[in-house]
Amino acid sequence: MFLVIGAILAGALFVGLLLYQLKFKRLIDLISYMPGPPVLPLVGHGHHFIGKPPHEMVKKIFEFMETYSKDQVLKVWLGPELNVLMGNPKDVEVVLGTLRFNDKAGEYKALEPWLKEGLLVSRGRKWHKRRKIITPAFHFKILDQFVDVFEKGSRDLLRNMEQDRLKHGDSGFSLYDWINLCTMDTICETAMGVSINAQSNADSEYVQAVKTISMVLHKRMFNILYRFDLTYMLTPLARAEKKALNVLHQFTEKIIVQRREELIREGSSQESSKDDADVGAKRKMAFLDILLQSTVDERPLSNLDIREEVDTFMFEGHDTTSSALMFFFYNIATHPEAQKKCFEEIRSVVGNDKSTPVSYELLNQLHYVDLCVKETLRMYPSVPLLGRKVLEDCEINGKLIPAGTNIGISPLYLGRREELFSEPNSFKPERFDVVTTAEKLNPYAYIPFSAGPRNCIGQKFAMLEIKAIVANVLRHYEVDFVGDSSEPPVLIAELILRTKDPLMFKVRERVY
């Protein structure tokens, strides 16, 4: 009996391995034309990344592209997993500009325990319908109301910066921690309509849970040892993730239930206008309110549906904005002439009274600040790598790409290509001035918010928040970099772009 069972299992294993080998051989044959570094059996190119510090991975990918790629296309094997890296805007346009490659790469699965099937990771019909109902949440009338939240959050940030200025003086301090708490405050209030007061209560259970999940995601997505569920679930990291997820999901669920009950009592669900242009015009609304009043196929969204999107909004609008702001302050601190122009523009638009609140109209007049933000995102895109999954054999500009391939596109790499941007390692905000510049920019060379149908739905929200915080900080302080400005920061291209070492700043009060 046991011999029969053993023989059946052995036979099944043999057949499985045979089928896998045939499939793998087919993949190798189909992709044999594509250049790539020398490969090792079983691990592929994994030995270049396993056990290496994160900042070394960025250098290695750039080195591979410069050394081995042909027409800016390169294959990289991570074990049996085929990855194709693309750095030609013509290829990028095909991948991002159509719905043929609408599915995210396998690395995004690490996000599913928190975001479930939210807009970032959903696909097909569900993605299309969710995108349609969420788009009105970023109408200018609603963004106008969100500026009040940005104003409040940035004022709290100023108080914390003043404390650190008095405490540390010329020795400097890291802006990132305060900026990160500021963006957490603003994203919570705009997403759910509640204040978590992260800047005054950084040790709260919710704030710590967000930090834990951010740490887990970075490790899972870019550490091969954590990528396999069977081994990952046995680690302390998995237990920390489970605990943090319980906190986050329970918090969001509680807010959803409370707000749904309030809307029922108010009768808002029946009275609100269905016209996109009127959404949010009558009353200040959070992202959550819009979801609670939305329907898909004439049915209201469930609490789980709403939680997926609120959590996605929280994730996408928190660390990304913090990263952009940190690199913005680094750029203007190391380019005093740009900082001076930003300050003069802010002062001329907002006025001499530092207590004057910023507004939607005023922020849209900050033209030079806008150029500096765009140039910062070219040099230091918050999301350094985008991924798509190929579901069936296809051709991209004559290049055969097999089903199952992960396509990797790096906004960081594209933004540093000399063929696409003159002096790519120099901070030149004027390159984005469509009025004065002679430099023609390829729309698929500059993709800090991705591009095409799956581009970042909240990019206008992000730009407004960044400019609101910048306007208030620069009205009050002159920002100086504490460090060697002749050496660029060492980058870590994880889920969100970071630096190997904290960027340190000192601030001086502006008197005028």
Swiss-Prot record:
**Alphabetized SUPFAM superfamilies for the sequence:** Cytochrome P450
Q: What EC numbers are recorded for this enzyme?
A: 1.14.-.-
Query: How is it placed in the membrane, per its record?
Result: Peripheral membrane protein
- Kindly provide the name given to this protein in its UniProt entry: Cytochrome P450 4d1
Q: Name one GO cellular component term.
A: endoplasmic reticulum membrane
Q: What does this protein do?
A: Involved in the metabolism of insect hormones and in the breakdown of synthetic insecticides.
Do you know which Gene3D superfamilies this protein is assigned to?
Cytochrome P450 (1.10.630.10)
What cofactor(s) does the depicted protein rely on? heme
The enzyme's first-digit EC class, named in words, is oxidoreductase
Q: Name one GO molecular function term.
A: heme binding
Where along this sequence does the record place binding of heme?
Answer: E316, C456
What subcellular compartments does it reside in? Endoplasmic reticulum membrane; Microsome membrane
A Pfam family cross-referenced in the UniProt record is p450
- Where is the major localization of this protein? endoplasmic reticulum
PANTHER family in UniProt: CYTOCHROME P450 4D1-RELATED, CYTOCHROME P450 FAMILY 4
Q: Which keywords label this protein?
A: Endoplasmic reticulum, Heme, Iron, Membrane, Metal-binding, Microsome, Monooxygenase, Oxidoreductase
CDD domains membership: CYP4
Family named by the database record? Belongs to the cytochrome P450 family.
Source organism (scientific name): Drosophila simulans
What PROSITE patterns is this protein classified in?
CYTOCHROME_P450
